[in-house]
Amino acid sequence: MLISQIKGSNGEIIVAVRNGPGDIAKAVVNGGSVYKLAMEAADGGKSLASVIEARGLGEAIDLEKVYAEGRFLPPITHPDAAHLHLTGTGLTHLGSAATRDSMHKKTTEAAEETLTDSMKMFKMGIEGGKPKEGEKGVQPEWFYKGNGYGAAAPGAALVSPSFALDGGEEPEMAGIYVIAKDGTPFRIGFALSNEFSDHVTERINYLYLAHSKLRPASFGPEIRIGTAPDDIRGTSRIKRGDKVIFEKPFLSGEANMSHTFANLEYHHFKYGLFRAPGDVHVHMFGTATLSFAEGIKPEAGDVFEIEVAEFGLPLRNSLAVAAEETVAVRQL
């Protein structure tokens, strides 16, 4: 089942669901919001599908028309945007067979002291990212991106700050979670995401990684309820006007990863800070495909498009650059 949120004519949230790509979406009767439905399921010991079924479905919704009209909202929002957390992890994907062979060769043949920190982290994932049942795997790279104020709706612009040196896409899968009143994390499902980052800043010094990730992100338009397919294959492209300036396949799913989703989830939610009742988490799981690696420099007005057939409509966002702001701290 695919679930999304749409802005109604009076500013209300309309929750839309459909069984899969190609099916007609329908509004959930008195849905309220995906957050409201998910919290009812989490706190009531029910599945999200059963909560939706109990509400019933109403009018049909043309999602392509909604997209064209710019009425998609992020597929989950929180009544208080500060309680939606955007986070991510990286160095989790094997990439293509050639990339995998190359990285294996580098990590197995090179002396430990000659490996970069990134390569060491990748090697740790290869060796310990998929633990046996009942065991804990190695912890991955982790970073903070922001909160709900940094969540750009599908179809909206990803706004790069004026001081940024780059604004580039990262096509990823994101896990979508709510925290029940007893502190238990519940996964709604997975969505396409663009973990928009400043790769030039990151490249200056890896200690700038934290700075480079403090950028908006977008996810959706639809959440695929349930577990993720083992082998996820999609396409990432960038359009400049009528021209496609970058297009490349990207892979995800555990068949193409050095970690299990469960291991990555554990190392996020093991922190009590991230199990505050009522909070929402959007956790992005990394990628092996970047236009930056191909020498592409996106410009204002370019459109990022990420698509995977099983996850519904593609995720599209344009690139915009914010005007310079004067920021000065004042003494009270």
Residue ranges and their predicted role:
Residues 29, 96, 309:
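Surface loops and adjacent helix of pleckstrin homology
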